[in-house]
Regions:
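Active-site-flanking alpha-helical
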Residues: 6, 10-19, 126
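Histidine-centered, transition-metal-coordinating active-site segments
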Residues: 13, 25-29, 36-334
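Conserved short loop/turn motifs at secondary-structure junctions
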Residues: 1-2, 31-32
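Short active-site segment of divalent metal-dependent hydrolases/proteases
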Residues: 2, 6-7, 122
């Protein structure tokens, strides 16, 4: 449930833009070499530092296995604005990854590996379903993909629904997509059983009593055949949806909103709400926060403050971010 707590407004484009702003220092305004951002890392920061249930301790006291699974449900790398990959690494004061085995790209527990593949299946099929519903993707193009054709030829598929017999109703199309989800899950279950049996025969069952007694290999995933077909469908999904005119226009607006909000907060910290500033200064109660103690120059030099700006923006919803941009930049004459 917690793996996407760190997601930004406007989805993955918001995540990428916030990561660029942090790592590149708002295009050279501050030194961004020590900063990075990715939603899986931010999810762990939320449950370790931002969300508090008592005054004595930060975070909500989740186990290492849960937090490690959250951070590794997706990749540990990201790209800068030039498309160059780099390892995501938060400042030590911002995130503690001790015991996470960051040298391994996959989760050290089977539960964490299950979350990662489940997220991959859900993201792929939900994107496809949304694209078909929004008339961005042709259902015929979707049905012609190798993965979908293979599913339609299996016993799992209801022979009562033939995609070659037009027209299919909305419910029939949805049934095919939902059936594809089941097909992918079945493939993962079967392939993972073999991988797990081979791993434990060679290495034994990990005891988890130390960082060295964990699952050193990824044992949960697709079969080789279905992996290739799922990757092919994902590439086509990107072409149909991610790079479409409609999504590109929406992404440009999202990047602009997030950039301008970040600039406003950094250049004019007093535009931040009291509860953010109070938390930065270590005050438990934002009521009556004294804004006269704020030194803009000191805040701009403090990595902790820059991380707080990032936290605040990352926690916004799409609508909140759009309204905040309006509040920051559009005069209200009413």
């Amino acid at each position: 449930l917690g793996h996407d707590l760190g997601h930004t407004p406007f989805g993955h484009i918001g995540e990428r833009k916030l990561g660029e702003l942090m790592h590149e220092g708002l295009k050279g305004v501050f030194d961004g070499s020590q900063f990075s951002f990715k939603h899986n890392f931010q999810s762990v920061r939320v449950v370790e530092y931002i969300e508090n249930k008592c005054d004595e301790f930060p975070g909500i006291n989740l186990t290492l296995a849960v937090r490690e699974g959250m951070i590794k449900h997706t990749k540990l790398q990201t790209k800068d604005s030039n498309g160059v990959k780099y390892d995501v690494e938060y400042e030590k004061s911002a995130l503690n990854t001790t015991g996470f085995r960051m040298d391994l790209p996959h989760s050290i527990t089977l539960e964490g590996q299950v979350v990662a593949i489940a997220d991959e299946i859900a993201q792929l099929t939900h994107d496809i379903e949304d694209g078909i519903r929004g008339n961005i993707i042709s259902f015929d193009n979707f049905a012609s993909c190798e993965l979908v054709k293979n599913y339609l030829n299996t016993a799992q598929h209801s022979n009562d629904i033939n995609p070659n017999c037009a027209p299919l109703s909305y419910n029939q199309r949805s049934q095919i997509i939902k059936g594809l989800v089941g097909y992918l899950i079945s493939d993962v279950a079967k392939a993972s059983e073999s991988k797990l049996e081979a791993y434990e025969k060679k290495h034994g069952i990990p005891s988890f009593d130390s960082e060295l007694s964990v699952y050193e290999e990824n044992c949960v995933g697709f079969s080789e055949k279905v992996k290739l077909q799922a990757d092919d469908l994902a590439k086509k999904r990107d072409n149909w949806i991610i790079f479409s005119k409609e999504i590109s226009q929406a992404d440009s607006k999202a990047e602009y909103f997030i950039t301008q909000i970040f600039k406003a907060y950094y250049k004019h910290p007093k535009e931040l709400p009291d509860y953010i500033l109070a938390r930065y200064y270590g005050e438990k109660d934002a009521d009556g926060f004294d804004r006269t103690i704020i030194s803009v120059e000191e805040l701009q030099r403090d990595p902790k403050f820059i991380r707080f700006i990032c936290d605040h923006i990352a926690g916004m919803s799409d609508q909140f971010a759009a309204r905040e941009y309006m509040n920051l930049y559009i005069p209200n004459y009413h």
